[in-house]
Amino acid sequence: MSQLETRTEPMVVNFGPHHPSMHGVLRLVVTLDGEDVIDCEPVIGYLHRGMEKIAENRTNVMFVPYVSRMDYAAGMFYEAIVVNAPERLANISIPKRASYIRVLMLELNRIANHLLWLGPFLADVGAQTPFFYIFREREMIYDLWEAATGQRLINNNFFRIGGVACDLPWGWLEKCKDFCDWFGPKIDEYEKLITNNPIFRRRIEGLGSISKEKAINWSLSGPMLRASGVPWDLRKVDHYECYDDFDWNIAIAEEGDCYARYRVRIEEMRQSLRILRQACEMIPGGPTENLEASRIAEGKNSPFAGFDFQYVAKKVAPTFKIPNGELYTRLESGKGEIGVFIQGNNDVTPWRFKIRAADLNNLQILPHILKGAKVADIMAILGSIDVIMGSVDR
């Protein structure tokens, strides 16, 4: 009777594109030696919709509603970068109040982004409970967005060249402060449940380690870069919008592993709360109801009718032409640096519109940090990167 020989050659396994932990339609062709990963080839492009070419055939006002479909967890960030590029190319100034409103929306989006990362990441490593908690807090952010823009998750269509589409509704700032007061203790609750949980720490500490040099060489950004000990945050580096008005710190860790990336994102939510609280207190003109009352009481020559108290500099006409020239502009999203290279041709549509997605660059290092890992660790490492395939493929 012949004995079956042990199989010794490597095995090739497909993870995805239809896999519950693939965060969209990502396919990983993984080569295994037993339970050890010896190679990994990500296959992307399943969600490519030609967003850049669409942008080159639309006016800016027409294109803004499209962009939140690239990354449904970072719609406000993409709206911001899409209007920032022609603003800078045309040297358009925006009112201080409009800048504060933008910061409020961006920081709410940063918290929503990290919450939507936290729940599925913990579900991937076996902790189901926080997945239900994070949606409780996200609902409050959706309610704030719905009150201000009319939409909840995507298609907010709120950012405009020169400012925003409309001023904040009455009572919105108070509701935002209520959210900050509610959410602060909830982060403490997450930390008690997760941060020092021995099972969670043993599951992800030391996984997917990236050194400071490797993080820089691979052009990583956002929490992926800061978790490796690089204090690089575009809100501090580029001084865009009005972030210099606020007192906040860059969230940073040194270890470069999955646990460090978790800690950076938790701390970023705390820092976003600090910015939100300060913005609610310092916004020029204060709450909309007070601002409108002051304008009415003081008449036509009221200082509150000045430029910095408006929500938009000047409403851009549908025939607004993007001037000749080219530039690259960027901002710090929840996932890292997103940017737009725009080339104008004195036409209503841009001649070239290149989008840099943060998660595409961050995803490129995945094969290198998976080598030597176990099969069970693939989803934990991929989850710690935080990718949304809509913006990877565009």
From Swiss-Prot:
SUPFAM superfamilies linked: HydB/Nqo4-like (SSF56762)
Q: Which GO terms describe its molecular function?
A: NAD binding; oxidoreductase activity, acting on NAD(P)H, quinone or similar compound as acceptor; quinone binding
Membrane topology field: Peripheral membrane protein
Question: Which reactions does this protein catalyse?
Answer: a plastoquinone + NADH + (n+1) H(+)(in) = a plastoquinol + NAD(+) + n H(+)(out); a plastoquinone + NADPH + (n+1) H(+)(in) = a plastoquinol + NADP(+) + n H(+)(out)
Q: Pull one GO CC term from this UniProt entry.
A: plasma membrane-derived thylakoid membrane
Q: Which residue ranges traverse the bilayer? A: none
**Could you confirm whether the keyword Transit peptide appears in this record?**
no
The answer to whether keyword Transit peptide applies is no
What InterPro entries does the record tag this protein with?
A: NADH_Q_OxRdtase_suD, NADH_UbQ_OxRdtase_49kDa_CS, NDH1_su_D/H, NiFe-Hase_large
- Kindly give the Gene3D superfamilies that the UniProt entry links to this protein: Cytochrome-c3 Hydrogenase, chain B
Under the heading PROSITE patterns, the entry gives: COMPLEX1_49K
> Which GO BP terms sit in this record?
photosynthesis, light reaction
Enzyme Commission numbers on file: 7.1.1.-
Where, per UniProt, does this protein localize? Cellular thylakoid membrane
Q: Which Pfam families match?
A: Complex1_49kDa
Keyword terms? Membrane, NAD, NADP, Plastoquinone, Quinone, Thylakoid, Translocase, Transport
UniProt subunit comment: NDH-1 can be composed of about 15 different subunits; different subcomplexes with different compositions have been identified which probably have different functions.
Function as written in the Swiss-Prot or TrEMBL entry: NDH-1 shuttles electrons from an unknown electron donor, via FMN and iron-sulfur (Fe-S) centers, to quinones in the respiratory and/or the photosynthetic chain. The immediate electron acceptor for the enzyme in this species is believed to be plastoquinone. Couples the redox reaction to proton translocation, and thus conserves the redox energy in a proton gradient. Cyanobacterial NDH-1 also plays a role in inorganic carbon-concentration.
Similarity comment: family membership: Belongs to the complex I 49 kDa subunit family.
* Protein name, UniProt field: NAD(P)H-quinone oxidoreductase subunit H
Q: Which gene encodes it?
A: ndhH
